[in-house]
Amino acid sequence: SSRPYGQRAVLKFGAHTGATPVAGRYTPGTFTNQIQAAFREPRILIVTDPRSDHQPVTEASYVNIPVIALCNSDSPLRHVDIAIPCNNKSIHSIGLMWWMLSREVLRLRGAISRDVTWEIMVDLYFFRDPEEAEKEEQEARDRAVAVKEEPAQPYAEQWGSDPVAVPAGGQPVGVPDVTDWAADANKVAGAPAPPQQQWANDASKVAAPAAAPAAFPSEDWGSVDAPAAPVAPAAAAPAAAAPSQDWSTDDWGGAATNDWAVSS
């Protein structure tokens, strides 16, 4: 088979029946040129498509080799001895026809019984794209690695205490499942009761505020007010005469009766 879709099926047919497969490009002169290394003298020739494999079919007619071909409705039948009608353009159809042909050859040889199902799956004869096959193998390896890796055990985060291990079910060990969130938190098993705070009793225990500490001089002179100067008792001043009510006659030049020079 020179067609890529039939090469895998031809190789499987040769492996199961012992025939000599020729997959890929056919070397001209394989059946007629005896001096080349690839010379063959087959007893029968089976081709996937007589149109694409016209060279071996023509050479087989020169040396009287019977030809069996998988023929479609538009396939040429020149030099074809036995035509097997099928769809030779479909990947699955080509693989199925070669699988059935392999099974029939083994049954005629007596290698397998007709009453027993053949253990070889037909999928082995189907063409597989190398890129898709490599992608499937990579996905299978990734799945195998993912199965081997054990998932990490989750844990419940509790602030201020050690983490509590959580089993696969998701509920921490020793902590019951709480469904009623409106219930009293103290009733939950395993939870300590919070301390009772008596604000009325604590208020009576508050000590009286201590005396204000003595003020110390501050190093920041700009932020502290200067202390007030001590005030000495004023000496008895002589009775001053009542100021005159006549503002027009007051002497603003220093004739006032107030003595501003009295020292304190």
Curated annotation (Swiss-Prot):
Q: Which CDD domains match?
A: RPS2
Molecular function GO terms recorded: structural constituent of ribosome
Q: Which UniProt keywords apply?
A: Cytoplasm, Ribonucleoprotein, Ribosomal protein
Tell whether Cytoplasm is among the UniProt keywords.
yes
Please provide, in alphabetical order, the Gene Ontology terms of the cellular component aspect for this entry: cytosolic small ribosomal subunit
GO BP annotations of the record are: cytoplasmic translation; ribosomal small subunit assembly
Indicate whether Ribosomal protein appears among the record's keywords: yes
Annotated region (Disordered) at 147-176, 188-264
What are the disulphide bonds in this sequence? none
User: Which locations, inside or outside the cell, does it occupy?
Assistant: Cytoplasm
Q: What is its main location?
A: cytoplasm
Biased composition range(s): Low complexity: 162-176, 226-243
Q: Note one Pfam family from the annotation.
A: Ribosomal_S2
Per the entry, what this protein does is: Required for the assembly and/or stability of the 40S ribosomal subunit. Required for the processing of the 20S rRNA-precursor to mature 18S rRNA in a late step of the maturation of 40S ribosomal subunits.
State the family it belongs to.
Belongs to the universal ribosomal protein uS2 family.
**What does the subunit comment say?**
Component of the small ribosomal subunit. Mature ribosomes consist of a small (40S) and a large (60S) subunit. The 40S subunit contains about 33 different proteins and 1 molecule of RNA (18S). The 60S subunit contains about 49 different proteins and 3 molecules of RNA (28S, 5.8S and 5S). Interacts with ribosomal protein S21.
Please report the name of this protein according to its UniProt entry.
Small ribosomal subunit protein uS2
UniProt source species: Strongylocentrotus purpuratus (Purple sea urchin)
